[in-house]
Structures are given as structure tokens and as C-alpha cells.
Amino acid sequence: MTSAPTLASPLLDRPGAVPGDGPDAGVARHYGDPLREQRALVRGAGWVDRSTRGVIAVPGPDRLSWLHSITSQHLSGLADGTGTEGLVLSPHGHVEQHFVVAELAGTTWLDTEPGTAPALLAYLDSMRFLLRVEPRDVTAELAVLTVAGPDAAAVLTAAGLPAPPSLWAVVPIDGGGFARRTREHEVDLLVPRASLTGVADRLSAAGATPVPRPSHCTPGSPKSARSISGAPK
């Protein structure tokens, strides 16, 4: 599967930011002190710039039953304010797409690996038939920022952002977007792209350290839950 170009993050302008390359182009490789940054995920809290992930919005009354029928996940009964993960499989059972899901206020949101949203949208469009669904790529509108570490909930609260109370809970954010808890000490924030720098500044002021994406962790150093589990970037 080929990947489309990704949007460069405005957080690359932060002091000490070293741009990534290859599949991680568009976000920082680190912010000047990789080992200290990685330790924040174990001892405190860090925010991870994952704004190169693709985001697709799927409104329409048939969205959940439709997604249930064309992906690997049981989505037909997904409740409002909850999330999960899903796959698109080839006819031979090979994984072609992985995405993380949030169901909120009449729209199902799918975020996926950097550069792969156009391919996922093309697949969804090819399977629409006459159903009442309107998938669209909103990567240019929403950006993903993940807060992780044992102090993640405290940092989110101090920053004036929601800390979802349970695993896979999804909570709206004032000003747009939502927060989704994916692990015990890990929350994804999907925020308006124009607000990304401001949200990162609020998290930093509340005590979170900017940290590199999991693929940049040094061997033998602390790693985030995503890199340990092999979950997506």
C-alpha cells in the first residue's frame, strides 16, 4: 500500500525539535534530549505529536452498520461516547488498514497511519453503494496529540482538558475535537489543527514533556505503551 504525503506539524517549530524523516517525516524525531523525554512516559507525563495521522469522519444514519459490514470490528452496537479499533482486511485475510475509532454525536471518527487516509477513504467510497453515509478526509482539520504516562490524567485536568474516566471512553473537548482513552495512562486528543500548538503549550505548562514518537525510542530506554505493544504510531 502506498502512502500519501503527510502534513508537516507546526510543533516542529518548538525549540530543540529535530525533524523526523522517512515514514516519520512531518513530526519531530526528538526535542533535544531523547532519553529524558522518554523517561517522562514512565515517571510523569509526556505529549506525543501524532499529527501526521490521517483522520476520516463518517456521518450518516447507516454508518455503524455499514462499517460493521466492511471492517473486522463489531461496530453496529458501538455506543455514543465510546471507541475501539478496527482493521480492513484483504480477501486473503491480510491487514490492509488499521484504524482507531471514536463514536461521538452522530459521527464515527477513524484515525489511521500517516499517509494512509486517502487509501482508506477510497476503500470506504468504493463500498458505499446506496447507503446513507458520507465519509470524508478531515486530516487537514483535525490533528492527533497523545498524552501518556502515570500523570497523564492529572496533566490533562491541570491543562483544562478532559480526562476520559474509563478505557475507550470518548469525551468532547470545548472548542472542538474530543479526548479518547486508549490505555490506563494514555489519552488521544483529536483537536482542530489550528489549535494544535495552543493545546501543546497548555499541556507543557501543566507539566507534560514533549516526547518523540515510539519509533524513535533508544534501544534499552523506557518506551511508551504504544511501542511496547506494537500498536500504531
Task: Tell what function each PLM region has.
Residues 1-233:
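Basic, glycine/lysine-rich polyanion-binding surfaces/domains
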